[in-house]
């Protein structure tokens, strides 16, 4: 926490000097530049130029940070002033200023390039606990203020954009660090964090085993996996795409974990558990992965809440004074997983049959040229979204009890 307080004091002093608002304002005038998976691969190819990547990132990363900082500033005042949100904001400001220092430096200087990698590592480590810290800020705000439906909707809108922004900046930093760092710690068959020949079924099986181990530890039992794969693009061949295995693993682990929990709890009195089914299909345009369980499903009224950042079936975690903030219990598993899917123009949806089970479907682009970053931009449309006020519903809302027409007097 001492380090965090130092960062906050540093950011505050910069702000008082008038530097931070000017830099944030300057870079927020630019729109982020989304990259395709193919472009990210080109940045890391054998002929990759570190100077080109450096020149792009020293401009692009401040633009992405500044855009989301502008959105933080138009959140409700009581939320922005919570200690946790102030801490997150200070991290972003400090990181932006660290990156801006490279704007006047020459990409021809090898020491500058080396220092830039070190700075990216420092920024990435500084932002390690952004997700749970922002989540704690939301809890602090809700504990002290009444949140109306419109504000709640705006928070959902903001958090989707905030966390998508974080996924994107982390992706760019990881690519540069893994490719150009002196310590080659990445997988030699990968280009940065991207696998040009990602074995989708292998990732599915690995994510299942990780979730199964967790389920066995907690429940002392777990369902098996029934896997089906269909390659509609190249029949008979293994299913491979260009993708980030860690992103896919994150999504699948979350879905398998939920499916196993539902199955074990719903079928606790049965002699055996029905398997969790995974179906992987590669088409000409899309890769689709369906995870199906017989865990009893959820009612329709709850389905939409499952993607809300404020809904969780786990106990709310207790934050301590360390930076190792917990994430389980904040209700972020599914919404963050959906963002990972959407990041490269995919999606993640749930279809549940209450009393039977749930199908969770991940959609990904099959072509790397169509897998393009989905990025938030702060503009007039985004600003107007936060200014929306509550309006009367233009659909009739039924009362809890139907009107007893027999007691109504007929008009003469």
Swiss-Prot record:
Pfam families reported in the protein's UniProt record: BCDHK_Adom3, HATPase_c
Enzyme Commission number(s) from the entry: 2.7.11.2
Domain Histidine kinase: 138-368
GO molecular function: ATP binding; protein kinase activity; pyruvate dehydrogenase (acetyl-transferring) kinase activity
Keyword vocabulary terms for this entry: ATP-binding, Kinase, Mitochondrion, Nucleotide-binding, Transferase, Transit peptide
GO biological process: cellular response to fatty acid; cellular response to starvation; glucose homeostasis; insulin receptor signaling pathway; negative regulation of anoikis; pyruvate decarboxylation to acetyl-CoA; reactive oxygen species metabolic process; regulation of acetyl-CoA biosynthetic process from pyruvate
Catalytic activity of the protein: L-seryl-[pyruvate dehydrogenase E1 alpha subunit] + ATP = O-phospho-L-seryl-[pyruvate dehydrogenase E1 alpha subunit] + ADP + H(+)
Site (Interaction with the other subunit in the homodimer): 157, 161, 395
Superkingdom of origin organism: Eukaryota
Enzyme class: transferase
Entry's localization field: Mitochondrion matrix
Tissue: Ubiquitous; highest levels of expression in heart and skeletal muscle.
Protein induction: Up-regulated by exercise, starvation, glucocorticoids, thyroid hormone and epinephrine. Down-regulated by insulin.
Residues binding ATP, per UniProt: 254-261, 293, 312-313, 329-334
GO CC terms in record: mitochondrial matrix; mitochondrion
Family annotation (PANTHER family): [PYRUVATE DEHYDROGENASE (ACETYL-TRANSFERRING)] KINASE ISOZYME 4, MITOCHONDRIAL, PYRUVATE DEHYDROGENASE KINASE
Similarity section: Belongs to the PDK/BCKDK protein kinase family.
Subunit structure comment from the entry: Homodimer. Interacts with the pyruvate dehydrogenase complex subunit DLAT, and is part of the multimeric pyruvate dehydrogenase complex that contains multiple copies of pyruvate dehydrogenase (E1), dihydrolipoamide acetyltransferase (DLAT, E2) and lipoamide dehydrogenase (DLD, E3).
Function: Kinase that plays a key role in regulation of glucose and fatty acid metabolism and homeostasis via phosphorylation of the pyruvate dehydrogenase subunits PDHA1 and PDHA2. This inhibits pyruvate dehydrogenase activity, and thereby regulates metabolite flux through the tricarboxylic acid cycle, down-regulates aerobic respiration and inhibits the formation of acetyl-coenzyme A from pyruvate. Inhibition of pyruvate dehydrogenase decreases glucose utilization and increases fat metabolism in response to prolonged fasting and starvation.
Protein name: [Pyruvate dehydrogenase (acetyl-transferring)] kinase isozyme 4, mitochondrial
Organism: Rattus norvegicus (Rat)
Lineage per the UniProt record: Eukaryota, Metazoa, Chordata, Craniata, Vertebrata
């Amino acid at each position: 926490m001492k380090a965090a307080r130092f960062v906050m004091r540093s950011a505050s002093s910069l702000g008082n000097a008038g530097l931070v608002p000017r830099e944030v304002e300057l870079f927020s005038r630019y729109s982020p530049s989304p990259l395709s998976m193919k472009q990210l691969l080109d940045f890391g190819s054998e002929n990759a130029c570190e100077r080109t990547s450096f020149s792009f990132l020293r401009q692009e990363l401040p633009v992405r940070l500044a855009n989301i900082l502008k959105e933080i500033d138009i959140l409700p005042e009581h939320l922005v002033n919570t200690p946790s949100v102030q801490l997150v904001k200070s991290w972003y400001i400090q990181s932006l200023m660290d990156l801006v220092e490279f704007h006047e430096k020459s990409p021809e200087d090898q020491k500058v390039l080396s220092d830039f990698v070190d700075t990216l590592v420092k920024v990435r480590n500084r932002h390690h606990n952004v997700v749970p810290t922002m989540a704690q800020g939301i809890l602090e705000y809700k504990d002290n203020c009444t949140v109306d439906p419109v504000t709640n909707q705006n928070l959902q809108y903001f958090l989707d954009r905030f966390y998508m922004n974080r996924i994107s900046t982390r992706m760019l930093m990881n690519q540069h660090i893994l490719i150009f760092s002196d310590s080659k710690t990445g997988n030699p068959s990968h280009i940065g964090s991207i696998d040009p020949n990602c074995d989708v079924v292998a990732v599915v099986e690995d994510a299942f085993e990780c979730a199964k181990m967790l389920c066995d530890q907690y429940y002392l039992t777990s369902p098996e996996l029934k896997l089906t794969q269909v390659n509609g693009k190249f029949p008979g061949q293994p299913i491979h795409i260009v993708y980030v295995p860690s992103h896919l693993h994150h999504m699948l682990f979350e879905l398998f974990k939920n499916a196993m929990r539902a199955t074990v709890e719903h079928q606790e009195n049965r002699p055996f558990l029905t398997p969790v089914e995974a179906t992987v299909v590669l088409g000409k345009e899309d890769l689709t992965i369906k995870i199906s369980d017989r865990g009893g499903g959820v009612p329709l009224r709850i389905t939409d809440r499952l993607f809300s950042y404020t809904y969780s079936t786990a106990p709310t975690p207790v934050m301590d004074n360390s930076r190792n903030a917990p994430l389980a219990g904040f209700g972020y598993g599914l919404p963050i997983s959906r963002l990972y899917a959407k990041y490269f123009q995919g999606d993640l949806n749930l279809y549940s049959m209450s009393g039977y089970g749930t199908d969770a479907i991940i959609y990904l682009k099959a072509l790397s040229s169509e897998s393009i970053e989905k990025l938030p931009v702060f503009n007039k449309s985004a600003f107007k979204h936060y200014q929306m006020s509550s309006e009367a519903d233009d659909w009739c809302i039924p009362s809890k009890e139907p009107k007893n027409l027999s007691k109504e007097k007929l008009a003469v």
